[in-house]
Amino acid sequence: MEASAKLTFARLSPRKTRLVVDMVRGKGIQDALTILRFSPQASAKLVSKLLRSAVANAEQKGASDVDRLYVKSISVDGGPVLKRFVPRAMGRASKIRKPTSHITVVLADKQ
């Protein structure tokens, strides 16, 4: 049985979030949550929350044993980029890019 959860338009850089996601891909749920709890990156908190949401979705679908779940797939895609301008000297302006991410996680039972 599979259960999934999706986080869209997260105000996180996709490149930095992929570093966190790569640490938990293929791991069991308890191991993944432990890794994320001690990870200093800002995206670890949101990925952890997303994993807990996917576990709740699995329970809702009727998963018999939550401890047997593992991260089958987890991916980070880039979302739209918010563009802002900051005034600089001599009438110039510099662009500030605020990237967003779409994170998708799929959990499955270990066979």
UniProtKB/Swiss-Prot annotation:
This is Large ribosomal subunit protein uL22. InterPro entries: Ribosomal_uL22, Ribosomal_uL22_bac/chlpt-type, Ribosomal_uL22_bac/org-type, Ribosomal_uL22_CS, Ribosomal_uL22_sf. CDD domains: Ribosomal_L22. The gene is rplV. Keywords: Ribonucleoprotein, Ribosomal protein, RNA-binding, rRNA-binding. Part of the 50S ribosomal subunit. The keyword Plastid does not apply. NCBIfam families: rplV_bact. The keyword RNA-binding applies. Belongs to the universal ribosomal protein uL22 family. GO terms for biological process: translation. This protein binds specifically to 23S rRNA; its binding is stimulated by other ribosomal proteins, e.g. L4, L17, and L20. It is important during the early stages of 50S assembly. It makes multiple contacts with different domains of the 23S rRNA in the assembled 50S subunit and ribosome. The globular domain of the protein is located near the polypeptide exit tunnel on the outside of the subunit, while an extended beta-hairpin is found that lines the wall of the exit tunnel in the center of the 70S ribosome. One of its GO terms (cellular component) is cytosolic large ribosomal subunit. GO terms for molecular function: rRNA binding; structural constituent of ribosome. Pfam families: Ribosomal_L22.
